[in-house]
């Protein structure tokens, strides 16, 4: 099985909250797709709550689009990581990490403005696979923590696992 890009970086040295360009690729038509690692928690030390990350999934995707989409950037998808330490964001374009960090913080401010659970988009049995597994309170707590900490940048060159380590795993 091929080694995926996300497993070639040292998770023990990742900072959080932090933005990282996980991957870039060019489509056959010449568009650049960039995948960002939006790391909310330090891997293996912290984890996002189940209900909190699920509620953020519903809110964050729309709020990030409000702040980042433009004539040069279009978000394709924002999905939670299975390890519950962050989200992957795939988009068309090549925004700088600082711009993504700024938009991420603005999106977290938007989460804090949501007044009640009924304002969470697609919160019903028709549009959500586990519509009862939400917590606006937990999502707001996550947002507050991100805002308080600020968002840094993780660089692949700083996190790359050596060939020697990879061979030993």
UniProtKB/Swiss-Prot annotation:
Catalytic activity: S-(5-deoxy-D-ribos-5-yl)-L-homocysteine = (S)-4,5-dihydroxypentane-2,3-dione + L-homocysteine
Protein origin, superkingdom: Bacteria
Any one Gene Ontology BP term: quorum sensing
Protein keywords: Autoinducer synthesis, Iron, Lyase, Metal-binding, Quorum sensing
Protein name: S-ribosylhomocysteine lyase
Cofactors required: Fe cation
Record's subunit section: Homodimer.
Alphabetized GO MF terms: iron ion binding; S-ribosylhomocysteine lyase activity
Gene: luxS
EC number: 4.4.1.21
Similarity field: Belongs to the LuxS family.
Cofactor note: Binds 1 Fe cation per subunit.
Job of this protein: Involved in the synthesis of autoinducer 2 (AI-2) which is secreted by bacteria and is used to communicate both the cell density and the metabolic potential of the environment. The regulation of gene expression in response to changes in cell density is called quorum sensing. Catalyzes the transformation of S-ribosylhomocysteine (RHC) to homocysteine (HC) and 4,5-dihydroxy-2,3-pentadione (DPD).
InterPro entries: LuxS_sf, Metalloenz_LuxS/M16, S-ribosylhomocysteinase
